[in-house]
Amino acid sequence: EEKEPNSITYVALGDSICAGIGLTTVQYAHNLMGVDVSFNFKGYPEACYVGQVGKSLNLDRDHAINLGLPGVMSKDMVELVKTGTMAEMNTLSGCQYNYPEFVDYIKSADVISIQLGSNDAFVPTVVSFGEATNWKSEDLASIVLSGNLRGSSKETEDALNESLKKLSLTRSEKDAVWNLFFSGMNKICENAYPESSSNLRQIVATVKELNPDAQILIIGATNPVPLLPSWSNYFSTVSYT
């Protein structure tokens, strides 16, 4: 049964998954604070999940708003839902967003989805991996961001191993990488979970204050590399808690 056109307003809060990063038609511009994705609020690709939800509900771009922000961590969104601004740059992710219209979009919504938590573990891991390899790992980070390592098949494992071989690491760099894989990433995920959970509660509370009548949907976090046990445990916990 076809829905009545524009019967509700849907607003999606989230990170690069929400924004549709990885799809070739995502549009954004670089600026002094990182990237400007304001065009993507309504100009997002139809293939991203906001586009698919909007299409299924018969909503136009004024009634299906995509507030996905690449690199955003949950602590950043705590600020953004309150004022639409980040007081300072997130030095780990290298992003700083300033969109006062955020608050107005939240107030006008009938349904609000929240997809966050991935970057709370992913960003510190990418930074730690970069430091361990003296930043030879940027190509591997790009592969992770592309989504090509999201499977758990033998082909995915081979792709990960092949990417690691291409880094041409020194002995000390290899030792640092193995330490990160076997202990450092566990610590990163252990630290990320309580912070992510606490921040999500604050975000939901603020959204309810701004718009007590809106329906709020929490969307599970996406694990970019299921082959890594520490990440699998983290993302399973975040998605089902």
Report residues per predicted region.
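Conserved, well-ordered alpha-helix/loop/beta-strand core segments that scaffold catalytic motifs
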Residues: 215-236
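Flexible, glycine-rich phosphate/dinucleotide-binding loops
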Residues: 19, 73, 225
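Structural recognition of the beta-strand scaffold that forms the well-ordered cores
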Residues: 9-14, 18-19, 64-68, 111-115, ...
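Short glycine/serine- and acidic-residue-enriched loop/turn motifs that recur at repeat junctions
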Residues: 20-26
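A structural motif corresponding to the C-terminal end of an alpha-helix
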Residues: 52-62, 199-218
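Conserved SGNH/GDSL esterase-like catalytic core that processes O-acyl groups on lipids
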Residues: 26-194, 198
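Conserved small/polar residues in nucleotide/adenosyl-binding loops
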Residues: 241
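Short amphipathic alpha-helices and their capping/turn segments at secondary-structure boundaries
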Residues: 1-9, 91-112, 202-213
